[in-house]
């Protein structure tokens, strides 16, 4: 390898494991989407993506809740391409907390609810993005946001793969998965979440050529919906 001046130079290339490469690509994409949201909305909207509904992503969500939401009026929460897990109710506990009292400390300063809540909270408007690659607990989260009227959903109908399963080992060493609990929406019809994906309030499809052009039509719509919620 030569330098711009034409002199030879030595370059050391360290290969990355596939997992580290995927993680880096994920972080880069989330950063670009966050920058797009903040730039397009002139700082009014925040953005964060939940990669999975498990403990690492839950802790990351709480951490990013402060960074993404600081000074913002509306938060875009993205569960597209989220394979699921089990943390919906913990995420909801950060998004649906109401103050039941107020305090007046001696000498002024902060009071309730500081130090009283398990998780950080966000009580301003939210817009949730979901798509056909949102599975299982990510679908339960989407249904919960819709059923509890916490905010509008944007994107595509979720996959419709919601059921609790366990497993049993066989004599040959293989494992068989077994369903043991069905999930139903707490609505008038008691909709079975299995085979019934959560329909968004604003259906938007990203076209095949959009990725090459770095265009995200679903995010564009979510930004417009979010701006309409700014007071």
Predicted feature residues:
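Active-site rim recognition segments
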Residues: 20, 184-209
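Short, basic, helix/turn surface patches
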Residues: 105-110, 176-193
């Amino acid at each position: 390898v030569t330098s711009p001046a034409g002199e030879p130079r030595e370059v050391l290339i360290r290969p990355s494991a596939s997992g580290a490469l995927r993680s880096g690509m994920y972080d880069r994409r989330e950063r670009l989407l966050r920058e797009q949201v903040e730039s397009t909305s002139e700082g009014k909207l925040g953005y964060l993506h939940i990669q999975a509904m498990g403990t690492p992503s839950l802790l990351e969500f709480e951490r990013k809740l402060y960074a993404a939401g600081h000074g913002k009026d509306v938060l875009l929460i993205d569960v597209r391409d989220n394979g699921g897990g089990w943390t919906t109710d913990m995420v909801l506990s950060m998004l649906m907390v109401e103050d039941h009292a107020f305090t007046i400390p001696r000498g002024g300063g902060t009071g309730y609810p500081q130090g009283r809540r398990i998780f950080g909270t966000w009580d301003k408007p939210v817009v949730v993005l979901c798509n056909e690659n949102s599975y299982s607990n990510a679908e339960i989260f989407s249904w919960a946001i819709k059923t509890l009227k916490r905010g509008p959903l944007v994107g595509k109908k979720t996959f419709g793969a919601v059921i609790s399963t366990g497993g049993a080992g066989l004599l040959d060493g293989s494992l068989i998965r077994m369903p043991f609990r069905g999930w139903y929406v707490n609505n008038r019809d008691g909709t079975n979440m299995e085979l019934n994906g959560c329909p968004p309030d604003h259906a938007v499809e990203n076209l095949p050529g959009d990725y090459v052009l770095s265009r995200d039509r679903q995010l564009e719509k979510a930004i417009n919906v979010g701006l309409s919620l700014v007071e």
